[in-house]
Amino acid sequence: MTVRVGDPELVLDPYDYDFHEDPYPYYRRLRDEAPLYRNEERNFWAVSRHHDVLQGFRDSTALSNAYGVSLDPSSRTSEAYRVMSMLAMDDPAHLRMRTLVSKGFTPRRIRELEPQVLELARIHLDSALQTESFDFVAEFAGKLPMDVISELIGVPDTDRARIRALADAVLHREDGVADVPPPAMAASIELMRYYADLIAEFRRRPANNLTSALLAAELDGDRLSDQEIMAFLFLMVIAGNETTTKLLANAVYWAAHHPGQLARVFADHSRIPMWVEETLRYDTSSQILARTVAHDLTLYDTTIPEGEVLLLLPGSANRDDRVFDDPDDYRIGREIGCKLVSFGSGAHFCLGAHLARMEARVALGALLRRIRNYEVDDDNVVRVHSSNVRGFAHLPISVQAR
């Protein structure tokens, strides 16, 4: 069944602030009433059921990444790979890029980063816990992931606050803005210039960091260009920074609203990875990803023409009662396994999934070791407004320090 946007009963608008506040009732209706949805005004299609989203991730032949994964019109060009790297490529270009990047972005490098993540978490917690109440996003979750990326790629300590501010500006959207706004464009250009200078510096003086490893990566004489490395570093800001910030805040928010489950995590820190996984399922940071239909595609007896935009909705898929029991219950420790689609699937499975999970585990563990309990100030919570990322711009909490 296809429901068109002219139907006043059901409208999916990824730019709508009411949708950002709580998309899940919309998703439920889409899964039940319009598993293939058409929005004429915004000119996109969408699939919401777990099976369809999973197949969409896995079928990189029928569904192309070549124009990127954002619905924002300015982002959907054949040049998207210049800022979104492999996320805006199809094979064989995607496979080449991913193979070369993987030579530097290794599981071992991520494992060896864990002590630095713990130290960065300690530094930010030392500052935040000077008071009993603070904004968890502004003082911790919004700082740590970008600082981890900066640590990984070799950004000096003195530049990290500036880089965090630029990363925030790249992603911010005002109410009603359905494209990349000029301030985000300007921040993107400044960030790319900074990374170009960083790459040039490490080409002259290699160091023990990811940027130098990417410069050295080689496969049968093939190497990454400076432009390709720059695009990958920028991708980490988009795909690795913001999503992890939102994961941390989402975990803290939802556990606070399920105090019995939070108490079990406080009592047994081995449950922290389960806390992370259930948050990834229940309220994933990455809610909506776009694909371009590579050739006429038939779903639910409806033909989607070549060149059309099809949105995959992992935020909906993770709440599909066809796959998960009681999906609207936040239940730390539930069996999730390979059913999770928060990191995608197939050829484009998120290269940074292990980094995000490690960061969240380390950061939340560091927090719980420093406090006895916390509460969220619900009256002053502010959500971020983005067409594809879900989380909090401000999450004020009060804590009981140990």
Swiss-Prot record:
Q: Which cofactor is recorded for it? A: heme
Under Enzyme Commission nomenclature, its number is 1.14.-.-
Asked if the Swiss-Prot or TrEMBL record annotates the protein with the keyword Cytoplasm, the reply is no
What keywords are assigned to this protein?
Heme, Iron, Metal-binding, Monooxygenase, Oxidoreductase
| Annotated coiled-coil segments of the chain | none
Give the superkingdom in one word.
Bacteria
State if Heme is listed as a keyword: yes
Group of enzyme by EC = oxidoreductase
GO molecular function, one example? heme binding
InterPro entries cross-referenced by the UniProt entry? Cyt_P450 (IPR001128), Cyt_P450_B (IPR002397), Cyt_P450_CS (IPR017972), Cyt_P450_sf (IPR036396)
The protein, known as: Putative cytochrome P450 123
State the organism named in the record: Mycobacterium tuberculosis (strain ATCC 25618 / H37Rv)
Q: Which gene encodes it?
A: cyp123
